[in-house]
């Protein structure tokens, strides 16, 4: 469910000749202004930890990390306390910087290992990386038998009257989310989907919410 839309099942099925050694949960918001992962950590910490445990069992490792930038002290404190029930899961506070949420940067910050140049992948240094939204979706799929039909979306910006994180159905038009947050002034220059650094301007606000 990350921006790169890399298939989850591929990460959970390591290729022949590779050996997972740890699971790293990317709880670093990869773009400024985005806070969907932060809200999930604060509102669903128990579910996130169960999801991490499920992923670790699926890939056969006994060590998991949750990397959270240090500008989210409430999430760090909450997850650290909750993780006491999971001695194999460690919450790792990370320096606030861009692009800390990049897979290679995250792996280096958490483990000290560097992923070689492409076509090398995180699994080549023993890491399986998933983001918070995917962890929560895995929890719901396994524990509640719930298919993926909704996700948390951040709607924010200086022109947004009521910035919010919304639980939206896949396929919901963006303009409905914007209206839910109070709408936009008529002279709004552009609406960006995906974040201010790597996102793209939306030419049409009828575009739907996607899984990635």
Segment roles from a protein language model:
Residues 1-107:
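Iron-sulfur-cluster electron-transfer modules
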Residues 1, 5, 16-19, 27-48, ...:
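Conserved mixed alpha/beta catalytic, RNA-binding, or beta-rich assembly cores of soluble enzyme
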Residues 62-174, 180-185, 195:
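Hydrophobic alpha-helical positions that pack around
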């Amino acid at each position: 469910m990350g921006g790169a839309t890399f298939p989850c099942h591929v990460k959970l099925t390591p290729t022949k000749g590779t050996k997972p050694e740890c699971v790293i949960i990317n709880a670093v918001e990869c773009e400024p202004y985005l806070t969907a992962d932060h809200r999930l950590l604060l509102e669903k910490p128990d579910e996130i930890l169960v999801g991490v445990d499920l992923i670790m069992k699926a890939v056969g490792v006994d060590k998991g990390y949750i990397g959270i930038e240090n500008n989210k002290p409430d999430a760090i404190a909450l997850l650290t306390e909750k993780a006491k029930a999971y001695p194999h899961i460690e919450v790792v506070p990370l320096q606030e910087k861009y692009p800390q949420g990049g897979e290679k940067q995250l792996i280096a910050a958490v483990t000290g290992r560097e992923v070689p140049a492409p076509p090398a992948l995180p699994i080549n240094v023993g890491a399986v990386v998933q983001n918070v939204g995917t962890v929560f979706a895995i929890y719901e799929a396994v524990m509640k038998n719930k298919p993926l039909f909704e996700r948390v979306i951040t709607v924010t910006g200086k022109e947004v009257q009521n910035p919010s994180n919304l639980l939206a159905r896949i396929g919901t038009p963006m303009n409905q989310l914007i209206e839910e947050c109070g709408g936009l002034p008529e002279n709004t220059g552009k609406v960006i989907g995906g974040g201010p650094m790597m996102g793209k301007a939306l030419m049409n606000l009828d575009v739907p919410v996607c899984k990635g």
